Amino acid sequence: MFLNDNFLLTTDIAQTLFHDHAKSMPIIDYHCHLDPQEIYENKHFPNLTAAWLYGDHYKWRLMRANGIPESHITGDASDYDKFLAWARTVPKAIGNPLYSWTHLELRRFFGVTELLNEESAPRIWEVVNRKLATSPFQRRNLIKNANVKVICTTDDPADTLQYHQLLREEEQAFQVLPTFRPDKALNIDASGFKDWLGRLEQVVQKPLNSYASLVSALKQRIGFFHEQGCRLSDHALDVLRYLACDEAEPEMIFAKRLAGETLSPDEVTMYRSELLTALIGFYHEKDWTMQLHIHAYRNNNTPMFRKLGPDTGYDALNDLPLTEALSQLLDRAESGQFLPKTILYSLNPKDYPALLTLMGCYQKETVGKMQLGSGWWYNDTRNGMREQLTLFADHSLLSNFVGMLTDSRSFLSYTRHEYFRRVLCGLIGEWVERGEAPDDLAMLGQMVEDIAYGNASKYFGFSSVG
């Protein structure tokens, strides 16, 4: 039966591992894109479209593939008409994880077991909207009811973190912690770089008229983020290049950019390489974990990018080389004894063996110091998860894996943790069935509990956050 108690669990051992060990473990969502202001204000969603379809480019891509007009995806159609357009799309999504996720979310959050389609949509709309108007379905209660203990948002160095501070004072059931994401500091060639620099100046209350002053300001913000509970950084390295240079070079490049001159590709790479290296040292000082998200190829549809902006469903994966540049970056940090705990993600799964074998060169003392990140974005599927888990086990110690994250903008996405846990238990159960792993429930049960929750709790050190 569809989505029965044992879906994705094809062996007895898998069923036992999930139901007795994985299912009840709390959730640490250590990388997501929820808005901390929305969490703090704790408002009701006005309807299911607002909770489900706003900002969800996963769904938008499927709707476009189904010929839905843009007016009913991101345009000015009513929320109800947008919901009906999604309901027309869902029956065609069998085999896509969104088919399972859609119905898991309806079941786990709203108790709706009916399949979503054009005929059932009006009934589901009414049932869910009535529930969304009640207290148990406010944003914070959705988080609590999903058994979430830690949420790490994604935050710019110039952000004030005011809502993190307010949540820290008021919310006892779960933590909402910032993540330091300094992409705008690194993207010196971006058109908005000088405007962003002005925002950072306002926050640090001093002029940023030199490279040295920028580095100092970022170090200051890292200290502030740490005080607010931050224990991770994150970087979008869509194209990974590395060029070392002498100490004077970044200062000259920075001055050239402020003067409005065009930078050469090599100058951009040198600046980014030096600034990222400096940041890595600061992360190490704070015992943070650094996340590197590699090989997204963004904003491919120029007309739609001009119309809708970024993060609207027009990104793909990249296939450029990465080993040499990444090795140079990691080796420079290791040689200087300031390589922090690191999680490496690639949007292109062909990169997994390269990342895994490279990270094995830098394991040291800390258990699982270097990690291959959970299947990211387009790899957040049953097959993608199994590939990531299998290759992790092939090249490292899967028992030390820090597990799943949502990487989501949706308050209803926590069922992805259940989906991941079922895939994990199913895979281990297959290993036992084939004689590749012992039928030792105590050992395997502990492994599953660790990957679901325990490893992340220890690795990131959230318990030290007051």
Residue ranges of each PLM-predicted region?
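Short glycine/proline- and charge-enriched loop/turn segments
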Residues: 305-313
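Hard-cation-handling environments
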Residues: 296, 301
